[in-house]
Structure formats: structure tokens, C-alpha cells
């Protein structure tokens, strides 16, 4: 089992680089890195397809957090194959260069990765601690305000209505995928007829005309108030106020097999609302084109994050709620 504090690293590089990184991870108490794989120079020069297949077999059930490539030894074919493979698994990619590379790719900014200077493949503002602090402060302030001003009196009121609509709990806890692929329990007001979990463990998507939705559930869903308990998730550290919406476990696996770079959305905490949500791409869907648009907006949010963007999304979400224009069902 991979704990939150552990980060798994795989390296495409020389034996010298492997020794340097291994020594650093063993000696540095702050690294929180587990160097779990390595391919040396000769391996890198073999057929890319063979190498990726070999790599897949080796770590079939492994979660990869960081994928380090010595870009001075890699051609464009292997580079493309490597990044497609790594990003499909939700890994961050870092390029280390021992000598000038002939590769012509648009890359991110230089940063320190362990003992190396590296170039990240994607712009990721929330990788900076100051930005993480800003986002966490915004999350905690807004969540505390919502819980103290609204949730404390809204819960017993809506709880009575939920109980009158049928048997079952007031708040349900659903398994969802969070940051770095960590599973967590997402809280929501119950909006559907209470059923025992299916024997196959699969949770089915809700559609617009789903007869399982109760009368009070329709109101809660239309106004997004069913997600009010998720502000507790924010204070618990599972979620953020703004971010990609959390997907169900079985849904996550299915989408990852169909949409490239889907798991990049794991780079940040899932949110109560998000850029994709305010653009109208929300709710369950089996339409791959709509899902692709949602993922595109999620990645755009990750790469262009700013505190102002979070504030803007929160304001737009609130406006959509009070004007009953949430696109929810």
C-alpha cells in the first residue's frame, strides 16, 4: 500500500545518475521518495515499444508519482512514447540533462528535483509551496465561513426532509479518487432512494431522468446544495473548494483506459466546484467527447492556477446556484 507521504520514482538514466539519486533518497529525510525502478543507458537505446512494454510489465500494479528521464540520451520516438505512458499513469515528468539536448519540445520551468536540476514537462503553479499555502488558506477560510454560517442550521432542516423522502442516512459517504490517486470518502446529502451497495461493487451514473432521485434530492441537486457536506472534506484535507470534480473509483479506471492524460487531474486535490463545472461540463456522462472536454478544462485549471482563478470560479458557482443555472441534475 502506498501511503500519502511516499512518492514512487522511476528513472531512465545512467548508472551514475541512479547511484546519485539513490544515495540522496536514502540520506535525505525530506525526500519522501521511493526509488523503485531504473533503466540504464543501454536500455534507453533499445526499441521504444519493447522498453515501454517491459516497463509496464514490471510495474503493472504500481502507482508512479515521478518519472525522471535523462533527455540527453533519448530520441523523439522514445520521448513521446515515454511521456504518453507516464502521463497515462498520472506521473509527473522531469527531464535531467547532462549535456545539451537536441530535443525540440516546449518545456516547463527549471526546478530542483532531488540532487538534480530538472525541467518539468508541465507548468504546475501549485507545485510551489507559497501557492499551496494561498490555496489552503482560501479553502479553510471559505469552508469555515460556510459551515458556521449555513451548514449548522441547514443540516437539521434538510435532514428532516431527506428522512421524510425515504429510509436511509442523511449524509452518504462515497468512495472517490483524490490527489495522487489516494482513495477517500466523499460526503454528500442523500438525494436518491437508499439502496444496498451492489454485489459487483460498481456504482452506476445518474442520468437526467433517473427515477432513483427523490423529490428533495432534485431540489438539492439542482442547487448543488447536496454537496454542502464536502466543505467538511475540505477541512479534513481530502478536497479543495476548487478543483477537478472527484470521480468514482470504477468510473476513474474506465475513463483512464479511454482518455489520454486523464490522470493528470490527480496532480491537485479534487474540488467542490471547478473550471469544467462552471463551463457546463459536469454530472455523469458516457459521452467520451464531453468527458474529453471536461478533462481539457481540468488540465487547463492545473496549468493556469492562480488564487484569483479560484475566487472567480467560486463567485461564478455561487451566482449559478442562486439563479438556478447550475447545469446539474
Model-identified regions with their sequence ranges:
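A hydrophobic, helix-centered structural microdomain
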Residues: 130-195, 233, 307-329
Amino acid at each position: 500500500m502506498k501511503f500519502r507521504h511516499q512518492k514512487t520514482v522511476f528513472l531512465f538514466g545512467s548508472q551514475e545518475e541512479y547511484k546519485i539519486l539513490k544515495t540522496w533518497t536514502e540520506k535525505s529525510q525530506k525526500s519522501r521518495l521511493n526509488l523503485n525502478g531504473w533503466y540504464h543507458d543501454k536500455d534507453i537505446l533499445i526499441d521504444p515499444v519493447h522498453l515501454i512494454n517491459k516497463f509496464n510489465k514490471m510495474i503493472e500494479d504500481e502507482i508512479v508519482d515521478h518519472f525522471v528521464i535523462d533527455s540527453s540520451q533519448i530520441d523523439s520516438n522514445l520521448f513521446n512514447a515515454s511521456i504518453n505512458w507516464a502521463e497515462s499513469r498520472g506521473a509527473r515528468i522531469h527531464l535531467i540533462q547532462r549535456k545539451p539536448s537536441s530535443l525540440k519540445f516546449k518545456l516547463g520551468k527549471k526546478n530542483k528535483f532531488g540532487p538534480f536540476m530538472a525541467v518539468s514537462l508541465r507548468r504546475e503553479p501549485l507545485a510551489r509551496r507559497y501557492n499551496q499555502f494561498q490555496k489552503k488558506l482560501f479553502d479553510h477560510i471559505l469552508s469555515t465561513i460556510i459551515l458556521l454560517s449555513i451548514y449548522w442550521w441547514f443540516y437539521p432542516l434538510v435532514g428532516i426532509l431527506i428522512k421524510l423522502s425515504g429510509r436511509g442516512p442523511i449524509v452518504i459517504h462515497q468512495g472517490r479518487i483524490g490527489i495522487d490517486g489516494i482513495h477517500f470518502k466523499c460526503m454528500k446529502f442523500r438525494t436518491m432512494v437508499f439502496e444496498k451497495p451492489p454485489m459487483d461493487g460498481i456504482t452506476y451514473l445518474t442520468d437526467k431522468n433517473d427515477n432513483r432521485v427523490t423529490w428533495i434530492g432534485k431540489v438539492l441537486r439542482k442547487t448543488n446544495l447536496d454537496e454542502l457536506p464536502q466543505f467538511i472534506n475540505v477541512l479534513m484535507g481530502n478536497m479543495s473548494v476548487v478543483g477537478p470534480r472527484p470521480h468514482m473509483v470504477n468510473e476513474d479506471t474506465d475513463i483512464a483506459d479511454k482518455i489520454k492524460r486523464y490522470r493528470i487531474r490527480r496532480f491537485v486535490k479534487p474540488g467542490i466546484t471547478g473550471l469544467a463545472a462552471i463551463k457546463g461540463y459536469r454530472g455523469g456522462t458516457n459521452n467520451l467527447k464531453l468527458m474529453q472536454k471536461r478533462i481539457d478544462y481540468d488540465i487547463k485549471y492545473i496549468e493556469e492556477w492562480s488564487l484569483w482563478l479560484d475566487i472567480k470560479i467560486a463567485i461564478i458557482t455561487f451566482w449559478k446556484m442562486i439563479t438556478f443555472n447550475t447545469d446539474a441534475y
